[in-house]
Every structure is written in structure tokens, then in C-alpha cells.
Amino acid sequence: MIEKLAEIRKKIDEIDNKILKLIAERNSLAKDVAEIKNQLGIPINDPEREKYIYDRIRKLCKEHNVDENIGIKIFQILIEHNKALQKQYLEETQNKNKK
């Protein structure tokens, strides 16, 4: 029984590692998005895109039997963090251009 518990926990640890790698990849892409938005003169906040994401997450939660509230909370955190990264990236870019 102890071995089974250890095996399950190891799988959970592996999943956690994959989740964090995917978050890092998402963060990196957020910087790319910021650069393109800056070139196009598009604001960081995009309520239409956020609505699309939340609608999509609700649908995916149903498909994968995940509590919708948890899915939405996770993506609220990710979206807010990515917007903060985009703002930081733009500020750094603007400061470099001033020098």
C-alpha cells in the first residue's frame, strides 16, 4: 500500500513539473504577444480575448470533468500574471529605447 501511495505521489510530482514548464512557456509567449501588440499599437488589456479564453476554459472544464470555478480561477491568475509580464516587458523596452 505504501508503494502504491509513493507511486501515485511520484506521478503527481511529474504532472506538477509539466504544469510549471507549460506556465513558463506561456509566460515566454506573453512577452512575444506584448512585442506584437506594441508594434500594432494594441493595448495590453483585451477584454474580448479574455472573454474568449474564459468561455473556452468553461467548455474544456466540462469536457475534462474539472470544476469550472477552479479552471476559471487558475486562468484568472495566469491572465493577470501575463498582463503584468507584458507591462513589465513594454516598460523595459521603452526604457532601453530612451537610453
Curated annotation (Swiss-Prot):
Residues 1-90 form the Chorismate mutase domain. One of its GO terms (biological process) is salicylic acid biosynthetic process. SUPFAM superfamilies: Chorismate mutase II. Thermostable. The midpoint for its thermal unfolding transition (Tm) is 88 degrees Celsius. It catalyses: chorismate = prephenate. Pathway: Metabolic intermediate biosynthesis; prephenate biosynthesis; prephenate from chorismate: step 1/1. InterPro entries: Chorismate_II_sf, Chorismate_mutase-related, Chorismate_mutase_arc, CM_dom_sf, CM_II_prokaryot. Activity is independent of pH in the range of pH 5-9. Catalyzes the conversion of chorismate into prephenate via a Claisen rearrangement. This is Chorismate mutase. It comes from Methanocaldococcus jannaschii (strain ATCC 43067 / DSM 2661 / JAL-1 / JCM 10045 / NBRC 100440) (Methanococcus jannaschii). The lineage of its organism: Archaea, Methanobacteriati, Methanobacteriota, Methanomada group, Methanococci.
